[in-house]
Regions:
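Accessory carbohydrate-recognition regions in carbohydrate-active enzymes
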Residues: 5-170
Length: 170
């Protein structure tokens, strides 16, 4: 093409889907990726989790249950992860196990971009959104009216640790 025939795209990020390459499992690779939401050169990645916590297969496109949103450093399902943890908004905070807190979702209600992830958690009637920062992420959870809603924080695997310090709001 000549310079005159080249079309400039105004917002190229709109053409990116981080779901590409997520239809993989141990017997077949379609990329072995997960829908990472991260800043360039950020400290960590954030991703929805459809696999069992800590098993290496963080997200599989054909699994329609989200178990949490994980802070991860995982480069590949074959290498696994370290220092990871997950958070999950729930309508009933008494159900803390990963199976009890999981929620069905559909890809029609999922937006997966490098700078933004959003999904509607059908079982909890919660809309979850996240956007990365250099060292963490900002979340927005839209809950139905309820007195039992909450957020589960799960340091679920070896090498992970979380300490909540209420008096320091940290």
């Amino acid at each position: 093409k000549t310079k005159e025939q080249t079309t400039m795209v105004e917002n190229p990020i709109e053409y990116v889907s981080t779901l590409v390459g997520t239809l993989s499992d141990g017997s077949f690779s379609a990329g072995n990726t997960y829908p990472a939401t991260a800043r360039p050169w950020g400290m960590n990645f954030w991703t929805p989790v459809t696999g069992e916590m800590g098993d290496g297969w963080v997200y599989s496109y054909d699994v329609l249950q989200i178990r949490g949103f994980e802070q991860t450093h995982q480069p590949s399902p074959w290498i696994n992860d370290y220092g990871q943890f997950a958070i999950m908004p729930v309508r009933d905070a008494a159900n803390v196990s990963q199976d009890a807190r999981s929620s069905w979702f559909t890809h029609k209600s999922e937006t997966a971009k490098p700078h933004y992830y959003q999904v509607y958690l059908c079982d909890h009637d919660i809309n979850a959104e996240l956007t990365p920062t250099d060292r963490a992420a900002a979340f927005r959870f839209t809950y139905p009216e309820s007195t039992t809603s909450g957020i589960i924080i799960d340091a679920y695997d070896e090498g992970s640790y979380i300490k909540v310090i209420p008096e320091e709001n940290a």
